[in-house]
Amino acid sequence: MIYNSIYEMVNDIDPPKLPVIVPTHNNPAYLKMMLGQLDKYGLDDVIIIDNFSLYPEMRALLKEISDKYIVVSKFTNEGPREFYTNPLLFNWLPQKFIVTDPDIGFNPNLPSNLIEILEKVSEDFNLFKVGFALDIEFDGNESIKKIMPWGKTIYDWELAMYLNQIGETSSGDPIYKAPLDTTFCFVNKAYDNGDFLYTSTARVGGNFIGQHYGWYENPPIPEEEKEYLINNAGRWSSTSNGGNSG
């Protein structure tokens, strides 16, 4: 099913019990990768919110997968936080759901009951969002050691995310109180305090540490797609829209 707006979708269907929101913009290889990872964990109630992609390969993919997934193909780019900033969408979603950027690689040791674990962390610590910590020691991480517009490197910023451990999961993975944007996260509306990024969020390390391929100099996507992303500078990014956390 393809919708042309959030309004059209919310007025036509009820939300799935545990939807997975995947915001996209001209990144078909990442979306295919993410859908494969989600399928492996039985997370198939996916809602793809596409932010006005014009890349032909992306348009073709959205059409191809619309028989299996809900696709909202919008004519505007509101960025990956629209699930929160758009009251119509946020109020339509159930109390608990998942959000993930498409360029996140799952840890090969990620447990099969990851949602159960993240939900328990949310309930135990009264957290709005609980998600993956991010790997900053990957090969070629010089790409995140450059000074960014806010005066720090991504590496230094992310290193600070590992300083405040508040507990462990039942399987011994450390839980860190840290800012969290739209990397893979479990969302619990019961603990929304109006602060999207900072005060009601945590990251889980250990076997939950994921790869953020958007940081890579040579990400696992076709060269043509990489060039398209580089040459279309209008793309939304957290670093230019009020945040710099994963």
Label each PLM-derived region with a short phrase.
Residues 26, 38, 51-53:
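Conserved short acidic donor-positioning loop in nucleotide-sugar-dependent glycosyltransferases
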Residues 130-145:
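Short beta-strand-to-loop element that shapes/binds the nucleotide-sugar donor at the catalytic cleft/hinge
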Residues 94-109:
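Short beta-strand-to-loop acidic/aromatic patch adjacent to the donor-nucleotide binding site
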Residues 36-45:
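Short, acidic, metal-binding catalytic loop of nucleotide-sugar glycosyltransferases
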Residues 2-4, 151-246:
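C-terminal catalytic/acceptor-binding lobe
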Residues 110-129:
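Conserved donor-nucleotide/metal-binding helix-loop-beta segment in metal-dependent transferases, i.e.
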